[in-house]
Amino acid sequence: MPDTKIVLIAGPTASGKSALALKMARETGGEIVNADSMQIYGGLPVLTAAPSPEELAQAPHHLFGAVDAADAWSVGKWLAAATAVLDDIAARDRTAIVVGGTGLYFRALTHGLADIPPVSETQREVSALLYAAQGEPEFRDVLAALDPEAEARIEIGDRQRLLRAHAVAIATGKSLTAWQTDTKPTLADGTWTGLVLDPPRAQLYDRCDARLGLMVERGALDEVRAMEARGLEPALPALKALGYRELAAHLRGETSLDQALDAARQETRRYAKRQMTWFRNQTPDWERVETLAPYGSLRDRLPPEGEEP
């Protein structure tokens, strides 16, 4: 990928990432690239808080609503599409502003995406059964013998990552750490800088709560109704958007709207908390921003030529 100035803006839902990205794009003449696994899909722009038509008109946007909800996109598919977009932006000597809340997308950019062979469902089930039979402490001992680095870095209680590391090591004969170590970053050092929006938790939760009500006022129920009419497979990623399940249940007459919104608010808070924890652990060297106020002119946030982030 050609050298270019790239800004990565990450953070939990409702933290103000899109507003910051748009402000930067206006000031620098930059272009915004989506790094949110829900906003990649079309059909739910209000529910997923995708940029509005007015916002889209203020700066070039890429990979928003680019995929039909019937498709299931992976990190690998997003990385391939994002890399092509970043190459194009670089060729035109523009600033790329990558914004979103999907941590694995950012990790794929900054650490690369390991080309790990598929792990069979049978092996995943075996790993899960072993975990259930042994409990986490003993399972960690087993994993430590296979992949000591992974065992050391995976937090207590993170069952999913423990199972993944174990299954990969058994299925491939090579530890997950080794696969990742052999992988080169997609973005070259010195070409990007990273910012994480990390507002006070109480403030973030208030924003999450308020936003859901506004989404309903702006047509989120109509979006869900139209999507339900398509009869799509419920397991599709697009239908896992925050609030979708609860609003769909309301439309089926299973809950009142107030009950649906209360349940959606609780789930949104839990998701935001998980995002905050992930970015705190996985991007410790990125600059933290609690509020948009101190930024003034955002042109200064771009990395000087040749300077590492």
Swiss-Prot record:
> What cofactor does its activity depend on?
Mg(2+)
As recorded in UniProt, its EC number(s) are 2.5.1.75
Q: What class of enzyme is it?
A: transferase
The alphabetized UniProt keywords are:
ATP-binding, Magnesium, Nucleotide-binding, Transferase, tRNA processing
Pinpoint the site Interaction with substrate tRNA. 102, 124
Record's catalysed reaction(s): adenosine(37) in tRNA + dimethylallyl diphosphate = N(6)-dimethylallyladenosine(37) in tRNA + diphosphate
Tell me the Gene Ontology biological-process terms attached to this UniProt entry.
tRNA modification
User: Among its keywords, does the record have Acyltransferase?
Assistant: no
Origin superkingdom = Bacteria
Write out the similarity annotation. Belongs to the IPP transferase family.
Name of the protein this chain belongs to: tRNA dimethylallyltransferase
Q: Which species does the entry assign this protein to?
A: Caulobacter sp. (strain K31)
Which gene name does the record give? miaA
